[in-house]
């Protein structure tokens, strides 16, 4: 892994709250969005997937690689000519990228939308999207990292469940594929997320699983990349974390920067009112100049005082083996067991 900046260059209606059980389970309903929640239709072999680049640009080789991966899953693909556009570090100008995404939502023949890459730029098109049209044309939308801005905003503005999972440049290995297919292609709930440590990470503490604060919680899922979430605090697209299970990941930020961004999220939003927090892998966020806190020490300092269940090390983030997490779906976490389980289907 490389630091985040180098990495970027390289690559519904409110549900009633359930009462806490005698075992100490903290439970919460689906809150925060004032519109009715919508589940997209499940993906099936033969479906047409629209490819988009809402952030950084991609090469023709990366696009073709993405197409090959999706075809191996049994999908067909389509894309606009602008998918290979370049404007500085963006995949075209803001309006171009927004129009590209809107075209895929409004095209009746497109069944799902896959981001080819993250990078940077999604935040700049949030104000340019027609959320009413997106709501009228619900479909699977998947990506991660920079795409966090779109995942949270589309969910909160439209009620549409979105998916934090591999982009087209990610590794479509057996572990990741199994999770993608389970979440995107099967309309069943009760899915307990698997865990598999990355190869070659045995001596890397960033891949260790551990509990910061024990306990169990239920709530709708919301979250993504910390630096992206931090960047939309104070905007109309600021995520509502209250009574949610918040999932967080990061890459290539020194510990003091993770500390600063997480502190801002805690101070500038309602993250303190989350039902629980589950963290993925914070790759290369533990490389620091002395004197410093370790990543674990910084996370402990900030999150243990919240007195909610918090765990670290689930298989998501900027890693090869990642699970697919649906924003807006009810889930249960057990911080003592470092487990996360979907309680309902994410597609219909």
Predicted regions span which residues?
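Short, acidic/small-residue loops that bind anionic groups at enzyme active sites
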Residues: 131-153, 161-168
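N-terminal small/polar loop signature for handling phosphorylated ligands or for N-terminal nucleophile
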Residues: 82-138
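C-terminal segment of N-terminal export signals and the immediately downstream linker at the start
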Residues: 23-58
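Conserved anion/nucleotide-ligand pocket segment
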Residues: 163, 167-225
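N-terminal secretory signal peptides and thylakoid transit peptides that target proteins
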Residues: 1-15
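Short beta-strand elements in bilobed, periplasmic/extracellular small-molecule ligand-binding domains
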Residues: 76-87, 247
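Oxyanion-binding "anion nests"
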Residues: 221-259
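C-terminal active-site/capping subdomain that shapes the small-molecule cofactor and substrate pocket
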Residues: 257-348
């Amino acid at each position: 892994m490389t630091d985040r900046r180098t990495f970027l260059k390289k690559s519904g209606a409110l549900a009633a709250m359930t009462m806490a059980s005698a075992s100490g389970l903290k439970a919460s309903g689906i809150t925060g969005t004032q519109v009715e929640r919508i589940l997209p239709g499940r993906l099936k072999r033969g479906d047409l997937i629209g490819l988009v680049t809402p952030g950084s640009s991609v090469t023709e080789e990366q696009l073709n690689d993405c197409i090959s991966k999706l075809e191996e899953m049994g999908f067909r693909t389509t894309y606009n000519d602008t998918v290979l556009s370049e404007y500085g570090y963006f995949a075209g100008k803001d309006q171009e990228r927004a129009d590209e995404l809107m075209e895929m939502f409004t095209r009746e023949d497109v069944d799902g939308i896959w981001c080819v890459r993250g990078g940077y730029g999604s935040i700049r098109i949030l104000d340019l999207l027609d959320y009413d049209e997106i709501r009228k044309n619900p479909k699977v939308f998947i990506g991660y990292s920079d795409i966090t801005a779109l995942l949270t905003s589309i969910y909160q503005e439209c009620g549409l469940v979105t998916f934090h999972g591999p982009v087209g440049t990610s590794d479509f290995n057996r572990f990741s594929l199994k999770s993608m297919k389970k979440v995107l292609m099967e309309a069943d709930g009760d899915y307990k997320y698997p865990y598999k440590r990355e190869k070659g990470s045995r001596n890397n503490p960033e891949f260790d699983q551990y509990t910061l604060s024990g306990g169990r919680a239920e709530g709708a899922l919301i979250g993504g990349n910390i630096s992206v979430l931090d960047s939309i605090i104070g905007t109309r697209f600021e995520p509502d974390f209250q009574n949610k299970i918040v999932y967080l990941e990061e890459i290539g930020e020194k510990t003091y920067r993770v500390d600063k961004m997480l502190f801002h999220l805690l101070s500038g939003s309602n993250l303190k009112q989350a039902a629980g927090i589950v963290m993925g892998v914070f790759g290369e966020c533990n490389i620091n100049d002395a004197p410093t806190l370790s990543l674990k020490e910084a996370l402990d300092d900030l999150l243990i005082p919240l007195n909610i269940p918090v765990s670290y090390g689930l298989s998501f983030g900027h890693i090869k083996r990642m699970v697919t997490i649906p924003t807006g779906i009810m889930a249960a976490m057990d911080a003592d067991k470092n487990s996360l389980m979907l309680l309902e289907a994410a597609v219909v």
